[in-house]
Each structure stands twice: as C-alpha cells, then as structure tokens.
A protein has these predicted regions:
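Class I S-adenosyl-L-methionine-dependent methyltransferase catalytic core
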Residues: 1-203
C-alpha cells in the first residue's frame, strides 16, 4: 500500500502497529497471510490477469506469482518493483491482459480508489481495508450503489508493519477485510460475508 497523495489520515499509525511511527506516504506492505485467502476464494477470477495499482514493493504481486497468476504492477512511488510514476486515479483504462484489480489502497484515498477501480472494465475488484469502513455514511452509500458482492473478514488481527520493521509477534490492532465486487452477478443480489483465518508462516 502506497499513498499517492499527501492527504492526512485520521489515525496513526495506519497499520495499527504498536510502537511504530506512521510510515511515509502510508507505505505498509500487505502481509501474505491476507492475500492467500483471497486467491483461494477467487482464483478462477484472477487467472485472467491482475492489475495491482498501488504495488509498493510487490507484496501482493509476489504472492500472486507464487500461484502462477500474472499481474501488472504500478505505483506512483518507486519502491523498486513494477512501473513507478503511475497515478492510479489518473488512469483511463486497465492495462491490456487483465480482468481484475486487486490492491491495498492508501487509507486516505480508499474511497477514491474504490470509485475509480469500479469504473474500470474488469470482472472483479478486490480492495483490502479496515472492517470499520462499513460504518461510514459515504462508503455505505458507495457499497449499496455499486452492489458490493462480498466482504471477506480476517478472523485474526494481523499487524501491517512499516517496510523493514521487525515483526515481534504482537497481535494487530485493526480488523482487516477484503471488499470484493464482481461484475457478473445477479442484479440486486445482497452482499455476503465470510471469514478466513490467516495462517501464520505464509510467505
């Protein structure tokens, strides 16, 4: 997750990690234990190619690659992975050869990322975010208007640490969830919720 702007965030630190200062530009690599369950659940929808538009150091893309899933990695900031200086919010269409957008957006731009991703011609959009995003009035309207398909809730609170920080094994302070939209679904179908248990040691 890399913040493509300088908008302030209403909480510190973004990752809910004890003892760490807020990372510059909200850069918190996504733990593999959060990406693996999404692949397990939606593998068939990811095999058509994935765009990761806030790729950071490639944390999500590396897990996709481990499963043989091709991805296009872009980011506004150069973290040594993918194509940098690409502002997702200014992109007009998805790269060729992808049918899904999977990313962990910067918190301060989460709604903008969601709206922009949903305007793209792809079959699936999956955004990682705080479970409490469901509480916000503006986002609740977005979820209803865009027919959110599924919410995958992590049954364990995982630390999302600043890049390079040592994981001391503490439990995280934030409940994480994948918010998933599928283009081809029954009209007016209600969103479903499911839980997954992150498996420690996944890499």
């Amino acid at each position: 997750m890399t913040n493509s702007g300088t908008v302030g965030s209403p909480y510190t630190p973004v990752g809910g990690s004890r003892g760490f200062a807020r990372a510059e530009k909200d850069f918190y690599p996504t733990p593999a234990v959060l990406t693996e369950p999404l692949i397990d659940r939606f593998r068939v929808h990811l095999d058509g190619g994935v765009w990761e538009p806030a790729c950071g150091d490639g944390a999500i893309c590396k897990v996709l690659a481990k499963h043989g899933i091709e991805s296009v990695a872009t980011d506004l900031v150069d973290r040594g992975y993918g194509e940098s200086r690409r502002d997702f919010l200014l992109e007009l269409k998805p790269p060729a050869g992808v049918d899904a957008i999977v990313t962990n957006p910067p918190f301060s731009l989460w709604r903008q990322f969601a709206e922009h991703a949903l305007a793209m011609d792809v079959g699936l959009v999956a955004l990682l975010g705080r479970l409490q995003l469901l509480e916000g009035k503006r986002l609740s309207a977005l979820f209803q208007e865009t027919q959110l398909t599924r919410v995958m809730v992590s049954a364990g609170r995982i630390n999302m640490l600043p890049a390079g920080a040592e994981d001391k094994g503490h439990n995280g302070m934030i409940a994480w969830a994948w918010f998933v939209w599928q283009r081809f679904r029954a009209v007016h179908e209600r969103p479903s919720i499911e839980w997954f248990t992150p498996e420690k040691g996944s890499s």
